[in-house]
Amino acid sequence: ALAKIHHSNKIRVVMLDEGVIGEYRVRDLKPLAARFGEQIIDAKGISTLPEETRKTLISSNVKIRENGISLLLNPATAYYSSRLAGEREKTVESAIQLKEKLGRPISVADPYCGVGPAVVQLLAQQGLVGDLLATDINPEAIIMLKRNLGEIKESWHCKATDALKLNQNPKLLGRFDLLLMNLPHSTLQHLSQLLPLLKTNAPTLLRGWYIVEEEEIPSAEAEFTNIIRQTQTLNSNFKLEIRRQFNTTKVLTRFECRFGDW
């Protein structure tokens, strides 16, 4: 760690990543070395600093670039994965097509928004988004989201919320043109609770991701189809597209459903 930080003046702190912890799936980071004024101190030196100084010194707030936009994130307090960056780029492409079909800015619901990588990229497109729901069960993620969004319209719904309780708010039902389902381990279990957020009288779009045993894809597709048909009419057969291997037996899949006349 000391060698790494000596090697580059741009490195402020070196952390040991001990993996994902807790229900919010944040990173367990331990400081190994940090730049303190003109000195470089190790973990023992860091531990002797006053608490406020130590907190500032080893803060894991970091700004990154993804698909041309800046994002503030903190992996120790809110989940973020760069692995879906390409998928978020494709979400923008599909959203633009929906806007062109409707001839107006679209209303977007992202119930598992995290620090906002998907919605920030949608908002970066001039005139693409009108109404917005961006929620997450992790309050720390919403704090970071609001910093990433900057100006937030009064009509937008941006707060720490359990996604499964959104359908209890009548003002949110049938309000959105685009629904993002980015909770890959639980998408199948949650979808029926979130579909009522979509409009039913105009073209709409559902995009989501799901982690599944590869051999169980056909049965999962049948389950998704049954859930969707309870509130929407499918324009084509539901299909889970494999995006990448998740582990030795499971894969990350993507689905996109277009409802209505388009």
Q: Each predicted region: which residue ranges?
A:
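SAM-dependent transferase fold signal centered on methyltransferase-like domains
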Residues: 1-262
